[in-house]
């Protein structure tokens, strides 16, 4: 049996280096997603879609526990995992230094159907917490908000499912499938 050494948990400085290496990066940010199963599923999908990094706040978020790694099914070894002190400040920094567009997923009066949003170039897709969605401070950093149109009576998805759908649309537009 071969032992796989997991990637270390990275921080804000590592994110700056990553953006220099991948100027058109596709990133996934999770705003206070606390369930390690959801974190693992998001990481697995991010790895499958070629996302360069998953960004989470250091506090009030799930961390890369053995459960999250197991659910990620190898994805935690493929995609960078970055814990930041302040997610809103990190998003503002990305916008200022690398012209990364921040696209939040939420249902509000300004939100576009996800397929109408341009995901080309450097982009970070931000998913909100399982029960409360995006915090107002995180919303304030979003250049655009999008929603996933649904035809059923239930207008809610699990965060990992919604992340998968958002990442698929981004990759479809970026011709990276």
Q: Where are these predicted regions, by residue range?
A:
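Glycine-rich nucleotide phosphate-binding loop and flanking beta-alpha elements
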Residues: 8-10, 36, 62, 109-111, ...
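Structured adenosyl-cofactor binding patch, chiefly the S-adenosyl-L-methionine
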Residues: 48, 67-75, 136-177
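Active-site/ligand-binding-proximal alpha/beta "capping" segment
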Residues: 103-154, 158
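Structured loop/turn residues at secondary-structure junctions
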Residues: 7, 59-60, 130, 151
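RNA substrate-binding interface of SAM-dependent RNA methyltransferases
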Residues: 3, 17-112
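N-terminal accessory regions of nucleic-acid-interacting proteins
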Residues: 11-16
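Short, structured active-site "lid" loops
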Residues: 1-8
């Amino acid at each position: 049996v071969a032992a796989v050494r997991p990637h270390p948990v990275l921080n804000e400085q590592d994110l700056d280096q990553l953006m220099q290496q991948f100027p058109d990066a596709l990133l996934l940010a999770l705003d206070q997603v606390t369930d390690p199963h959801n974190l693992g599923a998001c990481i697995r999908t991010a790895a499958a879609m070629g996302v360069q990094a998953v960004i989470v706040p250091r506090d009030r978020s799930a961390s890369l526990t053995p459960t999250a790694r197991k659910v990620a099914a190898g994805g935690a070894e493929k995609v960078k995992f970055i814990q930041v002190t302040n997610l809103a400040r990190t998003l503002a920094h990305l916008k200022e230094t690398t012209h990364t567009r921040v696209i939040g997923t939420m249902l509000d009066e300004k939100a576009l159907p996800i397929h109408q949003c341009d995901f080309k170039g450097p982009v970070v897709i931000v998913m909100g917490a399982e029960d409360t969605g995006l915090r107002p401070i995180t919303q304030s950093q979003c250049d655009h908000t999008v929603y996933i149109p649904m035809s059923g009576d239930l207008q809610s998805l699990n965060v990992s499912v919604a992340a998968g759908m958002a990442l698929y649309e981004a990759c479809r537009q970026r011709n990276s499938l």
